[in-house]
Amino acid sequence: MGVQGLWELLAPVGRRVSVETLANKRLAIDASIWMVQFIKAMRDEKGDMVQNAHLIGFFRRICKLLFLRTKPIFVFDGATPALKRRTVIARRRQRENAQTKIRKTAEKLLLNRLKDIRLKEQAKDIKNQRLKQDDSDRVKKRVSSDSVEDNLRVPVEEDDVGASFFQEEKLDEVSQASLVGETGVDDVVKESVKDDPKGKGVLLDGDDLDNLVQDSSVQGKDYQEKLDEMLAASLAAEEERNFTSKASTSAAAIPSEEDEEEDSDGDEEILLPVMDGNIDPAVLASLPPSMQLDLLAQMREKLMAENRQKYQKVKKAPEKFSELQIEAYLKTVAFRREINEVQRSAGGRAVGGVQTSRIASEANREFIFSSSFAGDKEVLASAREGRNDENQKKTSQQSLPVSVKNASPLKKSDATIELDRDEPKNPDENIEVYIDERGRFRIRNRHMGIQMTRDIQRNLHLMKEKERTASGSMAKNDETFSAWENFPTEDQFLEKSPVEKDVVDLEIQNDDSMLHPPSSIEISFDHDGGGKDLNDEDDMFLQLAAGGPVTISSTENDPKEDTSPWASDSDWEEVPVEQNTSVSKLEANLSNQHIPKDISIAEGVAWEEYSCKNANNSVENDTVTKITKGYLEEEADLQEAIKKSLLELHDKESGDVLEENQSVRVNLVVDKPSEDSLCSRETVGEAEEERFLDEITILKTSGAISEQSNTSVAGNADGQKGITKQFGTHPSSGSNNVSHAVSNKLSKVKSVISPEKALNVASQNRMLSTMAKQHNEEGSESFGGESVKVSAMPIADEEITGFLDEKDNADGESSIMMDDKRDYSRRKIQSLVTESRDPSRNVVRSRIGILHDTDSQNERREENNSNEHTFNIDSSTDFEEKGVPVEFSEANIEEEIRVLDQEFVSLGDEQRKLERNAESVSSEMFAECQELLQIFGIPYIIAPMEAEAQCAFMEQSNLVDGIVTDDSDVFLFGARSVYKNIFDDRKYVETYFMKDIEKELGLSRDKIIRMAMLLGSDYTEGISGIGIVNAIEVVTAFPEEDGLQKFREWVESPDPTILGKTDAKTGSKVKKRGSASVDNKGIISGASTDDTEEIKQIFMDQHRKVSKNWHIPLTFPSEAVISAYLNPQVDLSTEKFSWGKPDLSVLRKLCWEKFNWNGKKTDELLLPVLKEYEKRETQLRIEAFYSFNERFAKIRSKRINKAVKGIGGGLSSDVADHTLQEGPRKRNKKKVAPHETEDNNTSDKDSPIANEKVKNKRKRLEKPSSSRGRGRAQKRGRGRGRVQKDLLELSDGSSDDDDDDDKVVELEAKPANLQKSTRSRNPVMYSAKEDDELDESRSNEGSPSENFEEVDEGRIGNDDSVDASINDCPSEDYIQTGGGFCADEADEIGDAHLEDKATDDYRVIGGGFCVDEDETAEENTMDDDAEILKMESEEQRKKGKRRNEEDASLDENVDIHFGNSSAGGLSAMPFLKRKKRKN
């Protein structure tokens, strides 16, 4: 890094040296910084670092050094000094931040690409659908497939229960088609199945059949009727072969003869007949389990195919589409449950009569969930044994139960469950209660195919009281069976578990494949009561086959009389029933259905919240069963084992990838309900229903509702429509959620909710296995008192998950719809969703999830004993807000693709930039580079600490002749000769000599160290707010050894103007006069102590306000930093270095292995290098000797000029002037505004320091006012050189009072061309009388015959004459012009007190290379006496002839050194030749 801004300050003293002059020089190469340059700069077109970039860079630079015949010595960094370690740590932190940004950028890139792919797929689908529709329309005109459609369609809305399932004529057609199905037509069907993008090989709608016929070009109209029959059979056969592993639930019946035939031969396929009626469940139950499984799978697939056909017809009607999706989804869920039960029956796994299943653990470990009670268990069991024996005898063994998966007991305090023993008996054969081999009560609900088990002996105390209360209300219900009854109230529950309430979170796993059976804990639940339900299991199967959902209501007819309490110990699942004969009754009894959810160990108790109008009817029972300590310990042990198993499952599933299908996830987590609202049922009116639908559940047409969605539509006896919300718990574990349990099962959607108000939630079967993952949070947004966090995940579409903190109101009520605060929350959520779906502001985000959570940390939930509720909706498509189209048009898609492409380009650029910053140098890179140096025969040294310090020591010990580095710290360590930019593709190299810096800038090593402490370097952070200009001024104003300490004291001292000191006004006056002195005259050098104090006071006054913005570190000024620069740790060995010869064969091998270069390419680089390296001597061109004098920059800042001139004391001021005159110059034609001249005159008069010298000048000038104004105008223009091509501005990071003082360093690329002007020039008299001539020329300012000829750029006037005297020094007038440093014009009249002395060093370093001729003439006049100058000026005015005076001057000055030439330089000859030609 070096010292900030130091290179810019040193640029004016730098020279461009021909690279040929480096021959045979021993150069110390600081190679440590090379490594960083190579790994950051050498990149391929993709932004990745070039392989072995460090070796390639070293190889090329070594070749150039050898080609120049230098003798390089490479120096590498060693250990990092303690002071520098801080900076290294900061840089490492920046790299780590860059790496973090790289990961985020990579995620954005991936998301961008996935979105792009998705958009292209959508565009392609739109195009294909249009083409397909056109083809279908054309084929329909030629092909009649009505019979095929009628035969292949499975009716789902058929209300006639008594319709026959099959007919003899249909069986004959199927039998005939099955024979034909083995022919070549099967290949056509296979090809169609293969081409299906969804992997579904079912083509049942007429359009698809028409496409099949069209693709079979060999078919003709004559065979059309026969082909239809063949397709009907072959489709069924092919479908069953390809999808036997897919779960389905339907019912079908075929003749028993065919059953036996298929069962005996497993290789044959079961051909499903075409059905016009429903299936007889008795026939289905009599079949073997394997055959039931096959038939159900076939039925499910056919139903899915028919659904797709229906979707196409209603795809443009969102309401109908959603209703169709809901109906289809509910049927497929029921089918899947039946398949799961059949699968378990076929497996036959049981231990001791108890069904076993594997939970999240090892593959060969299974758990049997049971509990053993001490003491009262036998007594309690015997009390119920006699009563349940009778029910067990009545149990039918033809049911197909489905076990509840993933049920968990309470951790410490289970909520009690009380069941009704004395309730009115409505015997139903479908509900059976029995005792298994272990003496456990079990209940079977054959309607649902659900078997729920749980130990309830501990709850018998509460049952008696609850039964008496519930029996009255249960007697009123003749149509429904209450699936849950008589649960404890909240008061009793709180008595039971005052400390902690954990979650019983159940979820029925969604298994689309029969090959992957679910693994779960089976929990048995007893029930000895029943209600009126459907007559028999046949009716249930009829409803399933007909497509109608089955409803088992858990409420009474009138919600006002609802007194059934409940508790969260168990989760129940209900499926709506489509009862064809009594739909109106079912409508009045629709209610909330609760579903099992995933196990959540660390969550609070799962509460189900209802609001009822008669909450006071809740049963008040203080009887609580006492739980023994042994039971609690056993439960805790079991809970721990389950938790470990779940953690293992989470680890295994953490790498699972989300499917392509998207889902919309809405999780609403609410605080625990209050006592008043515990058993309340919240029914929302019609108006609130619309608002709820608009805000939460408006989904696109192809959506899928989650199993965690607990929203259902309820209707009361009065016909009032409402929405009842039910909440479970959001899983606390971070594992993936398979959220497909649906409690929103509607018996007749159209009969309950109008299409306009329908819940637009539907499903696609391919979406059912979507895994919901929560990924890293990226941002948060706060509104109100709630926090919203948004997270992005690298999937096909973006998922946004928001967390909103919701708090209970003052009364503890957690009613969602009645709480204004939560209404506000939902409105915020809705606005967030709307923004994310806005195509103009955001790309397609079809994965949007909004999760409302009171606390995302499980530990906080346990500590706060919060009971939270989750409302979760998963959908496969986007939200469809009002005004947002369902489908993007092609124009919108193209626009989105264009935006994504632009974003991809910008993100790629950002990633490449971050990758550059993230790369670091390794030790292996250094080792490889050092090995390369050995092959070339080049010595190298590893410094103990800093490579720059070692290079400086080697130069001081005369081990090397110069140092090649780009780090300005080398000057602080004591370097004398530094070469920079040696590897640029130019013929020169920049050189910096410390002697030039000391003489021309007045900056010694100590002063540069002080500036480094002000500006900041590798060892110190510097002072915030101080730039290069202020640093020079500080060093100038505080030149003492302890100047920096005094500077700190001054900055920290109070402002004297605030204290109201008497000298404050005087100080401001001194500021004005002193600043004018320094600004205009700049004569700080050689000043006395009083002058130094005055300069310091001027600095303080000018920077008092600015200093308030300077932030000084606590350790400033640090002696440790100064010591580290003055006494660095280096290798003190002075042993001479030796160089070897490059090994060509080894280099060729290395190039082949590392760079993949062939021998030809290697030789092209190495052979010229070796040839040049072996040369003994070379003949240099003459230009090489003069190129040292080429200056390439000059300062254009008044403030830098002023500070530099006075930075080194009396004698250093002259040397500083040398710096200011360096650089080729030419005078620009410049017009000075009148007010500028007046300002300059005024500044001269106000200057206290310059008054005395100005008076002396006035003695030599007859017309001081006008001529001086003219002279100032002319001199002001001379600050610019002839060629101004490259301008480098020195920016001062600090704020200062001189805002208009721009610091510019002018770089001149071709100074040699400045000497080739072909314009005519007037002769100049080179004599001591030049001052008089100058005065006269100034006096004749406006005369046409004035001696001074004003020229434009590129032309030199007669006052630009060159003085040829050997003993002449540069004039102070030129100093004041700054050699381009823009000094004030008043200083351009030379002082007579300057010494008449010229040094050889000045000529050697190229002093006066581009000095204007008139200024050199002025330098002569300054050495003469004032009286002589006056006499000569009078004589000059009398003669009026300048040519004779020029001749005399040429005669007197035999030895001429032109100001525009170097010491004996070739560039001076054109001027000499022109002068002679003019004579």
UniProtKB/Swiss-Prot annotation:
Residues binding Mg(2+) 1, per UniProt: D30, D77, E946, E948
Cofactor(s) recorded in Swiss-Prot or TrEMBL: Mg(2+)
Bias-annotated ranges (Basic and acidic residues): 128-138, 384-393, 411-425, 854-866, 1215-1225, 1233-1247, 1427-1437
Entry's Gene Ontology BP terms: non-photoreactive DNA repair; nucleotide-excision repair; response to heat
Cellular component terms (Gene Ontology): nucleus
Role of this protein: Putative single-stranded DNA endonuclease involved in nucleotide excision repair (NER) of UV- and oxidative damaged DNA. May make the 3'-incision step in NER. Seems to play a role in senescence program.
Region described as I-domain: spans on this chain: 934-1022
Cofactor note as given: Binds 2 magnesium ions per subunit. They probably participate in the reaction catalyzed by the enzyme. May bind an additional third magnesium ion after substrate binding.
Protein name: DNA repair protein UVH3
Biased composition (Acidic residues): 256-266, 1294-1303
Ranges annotated as biased composition (Basic residues): 1269-1282
A Pfam family it matches: XPG_I
Keyword annotations of the record: DNA damage, DNA repair, Endonuclease, Hydrolase, Magnesium, Metal-binding, Nuclease, Nucleus
